[in-house]
């Protein structure tokens, strides 16, 4: 007998009033939802199955209902981008705390990618990543990719740790 693990299903939401579909014409103040496609590609690259979800607008009720609908799909993980900083319209962190178990809001000492929200929502691992595209991808690689590897029973996706000593400063 050979032990096997099924491929994790990862629901992906972007959030923000400024986001539009990638094929939409841009109006002033709008940006394309490029994070959805970048994250889908990374999720596929690491052997999981992406579940693209609608954009979550900057509205508490819409975010709650959107995440609840996503939970009904029974994903193995949920990833959101944007809405996790301290802005007046950044509601993902608040809703994640309301809906979640042991949800942590962190300021990680790295750039790009300082804000991070993680924990469980409805028993499902939840990762709230920054909305900045570079920060989103860096955070995915550092935090989400190792979690997906573990869900699959793999060790090759887990980032190695290296210790070093700084011998000179510029």
Regions found by a protein language model. Name each.
Residues 95-170:
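Flexible glycine/proline-rich
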Residues 1-57, 68-69:
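Short, glycine/charged-enriched hinge/interface segments at domain edges or termini
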Residues 40-99:
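N-terminal small/polar loop signature for handling phosphorylated ligands or for N-terminal nucleophile
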Residues 17-18, 83-86, 131:
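Short glycine-rich anion-binding loops that position phosphate/pyrophosphate groups of nucleotides
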Residues 30-36, 57-63, 106-115:
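A general structural motif
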Residues 2-6, 44-45, 69-72, 109-110, ...:
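Solvent-exposed alpha-helices and their adjacent loops that cap or buttress functional pockets
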Residues 21-22, 86-90, 136-137:
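Short glycine/serine/threonine-rich phosphate/pyrophosphate-binding segments
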Residues 1-4, 30, 67-68, 106, ...:
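A generic local secondary-structure boundary/capping motif
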């Amino acid at each position: 007998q050979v032990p096997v693990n099924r491929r994790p299903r990862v629901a992906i939401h972007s959030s923000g009033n400024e986001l539009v579909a990638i094929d939409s014409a841009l109006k002033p103040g709008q940006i394309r939802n490029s994070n959805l496609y970048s994250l889908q590609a990374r999720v596929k690259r690491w052997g999981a199955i992406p579940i693209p979800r609608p954009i979550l607008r900057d509205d508490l009720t819409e975010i709650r209902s959107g995440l609840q609908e996503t939970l009904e799909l029974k994903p193995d993980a949920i990833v959101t981008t944007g809405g996790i900083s301290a802005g007046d319209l950044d509601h993902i962190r608040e809703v994640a705390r309301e809906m979640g178990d042991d949800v942590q809001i962190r300021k990680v000492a790295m750039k790009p990618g300082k804000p991070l929200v993680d924990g469980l929502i409805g028993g499902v691992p939840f990762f709230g990543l920054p909305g900045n595209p570079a920060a989103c991808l860096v955070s995915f690689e550092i935090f989400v990719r190792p979690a997906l590897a573990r869900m699959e029973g793999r060790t090759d996706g887990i980032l190695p740790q290296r210790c070093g000593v700084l011998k000179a400063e510029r």
